[in-house]
UniProtKB/Swiss-Prot annotation:
Catalyzes the second (last) step of the biosynthesis of Kdo8N (8-amino-3,8-dideoxy-D-manno-octulosonate) from Kdo (3-deoxy-D-manno-octulosonate). It comes from Shewanella oneidensis (strain ATCC 700550 / JCM 31522 / CIP 106686 / LMG 19005 / NCIMB 14063 / MR-1). It catalyses: 8-amino-3,8-dideoxy-alpha-D-manno-octulosonate + 2-oxoglutarate = 3,8-dideoxy-8-oxo-alpha-D-manno-octulosonate + L-glutamate. This is 8-amino-3,8-dideoxy-alpha-D-manno-octulosonate transaminase. One of its GO terms (biological process) is lipopolysaccharide biosynthetic process.
């Protein structure tokens, strides 16, 4: 990853198709299109590739998260369990839905742990926002059992994990509803874009209406459509979908390359005594966008992070100090900072986010580095990278 490394004539042709007829709106205006529907085509291909009943494209992964929550009935005052290690959008979307983020511990899958989830469930818990971080999955069997036991909605945030699977089932399709992101640095890209996927027709209907001001999309006269519900504008454009359609056709190739490149580096690093690797519940389903490894101590991890950079090993993320991916660095979240008061401020007994403690997660993330796996590496570049990694550890 990212998918833009494989941009080529296929993407140019799909975008040119849209420019030829000149209409970028995803709905209606059939007479102007010459039967060209890039958004519909990408949605249909997503359904086929993920073996899921419904897919709905949106303007971003964040839009997909908020739409999925609203479509699944998650709203005012509902508690949603979320990990402290995720992109901040996973939490912001909960706030914007009027719900209450509840942070739970992760384990060495780098995803929510079953024990962490159980520890924070209350009578107000409505859903789990299960984030498949860095391309791989959580302990799905155990977490699905928890959802069944407590009657919880399972939302899969697979924004970083398209192309991954668990026991042969695509990540994002295992829970009640799933989300993908197609921003500029994801496994495949629309430039900006996202998707909601589900086998639940009610959730799908809510999603496509909510993301287009409540339009029911029945008939061919947009102005005559009904508005069964309120909503917002999270529509994707045909230009973005055209780019994404070409990229989606390359997904299998992208995953194959990532897995090959990751294996070469992981095999080489396995001989380094102080290195251990992230737990992956189904290794065959790893999308391989990152190689995440752990070191014995926080101090050693900080040292190696600096030495990798000094030796030219780029794309290595020490998330523990990253401003966008770990709870302890989100002062704006902890202090509920926004341009105006958020719905959660109306809840008297809301969590004090300045006092959230996740010691197990801290112990894991302070010792974890994730290495981005690129598509464009040649065999020679991979060999050079391996040598530079070994140099960093030997110094």
């Amino acid at each position: 990853m990212p998918g833009f490394e494989l941009f080529g004539p296929e993407e140019k042709q799909e975008v040119a198709d849209v420019m030829e007829h000149g209409f970028t709106f995803r709905y209606n205006f059939d007479h102007m299109r010459n039967d060209r529907w890039k958004t519909r085509d990408m949605e249909q291909l997503l359904c086929e590739k993920m073996n899921v009943k419904h897919a709905h494209l949106l303007s971003s992964g964040t839009a997909a998260l908020q739409t999925a929550m609203m479509a699944a009935g998650i709203g005012a005052g509902d508690e949603v369990i979320v990990p402290p290690f995720t992109f901040v959008a996973s939490v912001e979307a909960i706030f914007m839905a009027g719900a209450v983020p509840i942070f739970a511990e992760i384990d060495e899958t780098l995803c929510l742990s079953p024990e962490g989830i159980e520890a924070v469930i209350t009578p107000r818990t409505k859903a789990i926002n299960l984030v498949h971080m860095c391309g791989s999955m959580a302990k799905m069997d155990e977490i699905k059992a928890i959802c069944k036991k407590h009657n919880l909605v399972l939302l899969e945030d697979a924004c970083q994990a398209i192309g991954g699977s668990y026991k042969g089932q695509a990540l994002g399709t295992i829970g009640d509803v799933g989300c993908y992101s197609f921003d500029s640095v994801k496994t495949i890209t629309c430039g900006e874009g996202g998707a909601v996927i589900t086998n639940n027709t009610e959730i799908y209907d809510n999603a496509h209406m909510f993301s287009d001001h409540g339009h029911d999309h029945i008939g061919k006269d947009r102005g005559a459509e009904s508005h069964p519900i309120m909503g917002l504008n999270f529509r994707i454009s045909e230009m973005n979908a055209a780019l994404g359609l070409a990229q989606l056709r390359k997904l299998d190739t992208i995953i194959d390359i990532q897995r090959k490149n990751k294996k070469a580096i992981k095999d080489a690093m396995a001989s380094i005594p102080e290195v251990s690797f992230r737990e992956i519940p189904d290794p065959e389903g790893d999308s391989a966008g990152f190689l995440s490894f752990m070191l014995p101590t926080e101090a050693r991890t900080q040292e190696i992070s600096k030495k990798l950079a000094a030796n030219g090993v780029d794309g290595c993320f020490y998330w523990y100090v990253n401003n966008w991916h770990y709870l302890k660095n989100w002062k704006h979240i902890q202090e509920l900072k926004a341009p105006a008061a958020l719905p959660i401020t109306l809840i008297a007994d809301r969590p004090d986010y300045t006092q959230i403690s996740v010691p197990k997660s801290d112990a894991i993330m302070s010792r974890t580095i994730s290495m981005l796996i690129k598509l464009s590496w040649t065999d020679a570049q991979i060999a050079e990278r391996i040598e530079n990694i070994k140099k960093a550890f030997a110094q």
